[in-house]
């Protein structure tokens, strides 16, 4: 199992029992190296939908071996002719979803080089793309702009404090943040 799929499996195993979690299926294009010419391929907004009363959360999970995640890893390949990233619409759709009450949208980045994981609001990830000159998001920026998701290493796998993340997001929603 590749590291991305393992991160997703560990994240899903960390979901608290009082939350509903659904993993949106990857398209066939994903399995064929991002082949965009496949007909009828699914193009999902995010990786996971997590619902715990009274909130719904959209999570896109990314893992990277380096201390900085390239924008192409978040937004897909850059199309010079169109001056945009191939999957940029996913993040803009997540930002649109954030506009509805009781709903959040985050890009969760696992920086394996520093063993830290952060849930960054999709709106801040999109703002980084347009306002920063960097081509990658360093973990220090994620620490400043996101919420750290604490992790505990088991023998082989990891458990993430998803319950703590959901509680924090619920509290921020209650406070109107």
Protein language model regions, located:
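Beta-rich catalytic cores
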Residues: 44
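Nucleic-acid nuclease catalytic cores
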Residues: 92-127
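Mg2+/Mn2+-dependent nuclease catalytic core
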Residues: 64-93
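Conserved catalytic cores of phosphodiester-cleaving nucleases, focusing on short active-site segments
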Residues: 48-50, 55-67
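Charged phosphate-binding loop/patch that engages nucleotide di/tri-phosphates or the phosphate backbone
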Residues: 142-177
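Short, solvent-exposed loop/turn segments at secondary-structure junctions
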Residues: 29-32, 66-69, 115
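Acidic-basic catalytic patches of nuclease active cores, encompassing PD-(D/E)XK
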Residues: 1-41, 176
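Short, low-complexity, polybasic intrinsically disordered segments
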Residues: 122-156
């Amino acid at each position: 199992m590749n590291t991305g799929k393992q991160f997703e499996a560990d994240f899903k195993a960390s979901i608290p029992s009082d939350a509903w979690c659904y993993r949106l299926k990857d398209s066939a294009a994903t399995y064929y190296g991002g082949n965009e010419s496949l007909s009828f391929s699914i193009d999902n907004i995010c990786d996971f939908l997590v619902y715990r009363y009274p909130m719904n959360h959209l999570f896109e999970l990314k893992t990277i071996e380096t201390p900085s995640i390239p924008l192409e890893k978040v937004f897909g390949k850059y199309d010079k002719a169109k001056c945009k990233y191939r999957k940029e619409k996913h993040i803009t759709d997540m930002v649109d979803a954030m506009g509805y009450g009781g709903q959040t949208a985050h890009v969760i980045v696992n920086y394996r080089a520093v063993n830290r994981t952060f849930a960054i609001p999709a709106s801040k990830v999109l703002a980084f793309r347009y306002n920063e000159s960097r081509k990658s998001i360093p973990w220090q920026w994620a620490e400043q702009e996101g919420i750290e998701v604490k992790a505990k290493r088991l023998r082989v796998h990891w458990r993430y404090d998803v319950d703590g993340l959901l509680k924090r997001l619920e509290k921020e929603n209650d406070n109107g943040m």
